[in-house]
Amino acid sequence: DKHPKLIYCSITGYGQTGPLKNKAGHDINYLALSGLASYSGRQETGPVLSGTQIADIAGGSHHAVMAVLASVIERANTGKGQYLDISMSDAAFALNTMFGASALVGEKDPGYGTEMLNGGLFYDYYKTSDDRYLSIGSLEPAFVISLLKHLGLESYLVKIANQKLDNQSQIKKVISDKIAEKTFDQWTKEFSELDACVEPVLSINEAAAHPHFIQRNMLCEAIDQNGHKIKQINTALPFKSTQNHTAGCQLGHHSREVLESLSYGDQEIDHLIQTGCIKIS
C-alpha cells in the first residue's frame, strides 16, 4: 500500500502457494515433476540429463523477465505495480507446448522416442566414424529429399511417408550406418554446402570459433576488477547501442560500502569481518 507502483518479483522452485511451496528442489526435480522428463530421453535409458538448466533458465529466469516487462507496460497504463510469484516448476510445466496440447486433448502421453521431435522419426543425433555426432532435422519434404539423395538413399523416400515406428526404426538404422562410414570433418564439409537441416554437434569452444557466431557478435570481452579482459558469451538480444561489458566482482567486494550505506560504523563493520559474519574481498 505504501508503494503502489512497486513491481516485486520472486522466483522459487514451487511458488508461494500450493502443497510444495516450502519444499526444496533443483532443475532436475522441476523437469521430472512437470512431465518434461517423461518424454525427453531414450527407450533404452529413460530420461536424460540436459546440459543446461532448462527449468531454471528457460523456465524461471525467462518467465520472470517477461512478467516484469509486462508489468512495467501495465504500470505505464494503470499506474499500479504488482507482486509476481514465479515458480520454476510452473514455468517448466508451461514448456510442455505441442506435446502437452496433444496429450491433454488425446489423453495419451508421449513416450521416449515415439514422437516426431523426440526420436520417433529420423530426427536425431547420429555418430560418425570417429565417434562424434551430427544432428539431422530434415523433417520437411524438400529437406528429406535433399538428405536422402546426398546419402544415396533415394529408395527410402516412399518408406519415409509411412510413419509407423517399425518403418522409422529401419530408416534410422540405415541412416545411422551411412553416417558411420565417414568422419565428423568429412560430413561437416559436405553438409556445409547442402541445405538439408544437418549440422555438426560442436563443443562450446568450437561454437565460439564458428564464423556465424563471430559475425553475429555472439562473443564479447568483459573487464574484471583488476582490469583483465575475459572472453564471454554475449547476449542474444540485438541492441544497437554500445554495451559496456563488465565482469562480476568477487564475493564481498562491496560489503563495506553496503554496510556503510545502512549506517554501520567502521568499528561495527570491522567486528563483523573479524567474527566471520561477512566477507571482504
What are these regions (language model features)?
Residues 122-194, 198:
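Aromatic-enriched alpha-helical interface/lid elements that frame and gate functional surfaces
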Residues 63, 67-71, 146-150, 174, ...:
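Alpha-helical scaffold segments in soluble metabolic enzymes
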Residues 92, 167, 206-210, 280:
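Beta-rich nucleic-acid/ligand-interaction surfaces
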Residues 1-134, 138:
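Active-site-adjacent "lid/gating" segments in soluble enzymes
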Residues 193-243:
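A glycine-rich dinucleotide-binding beta-alpha-beta segment and adjacent secondary-structure elements
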Residues 223-273:
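Flexible, small-/acidic-enriched active-site or ligand-binding loops
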Residues 209, 267-281:
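Amphipathic terminal alpha-helices
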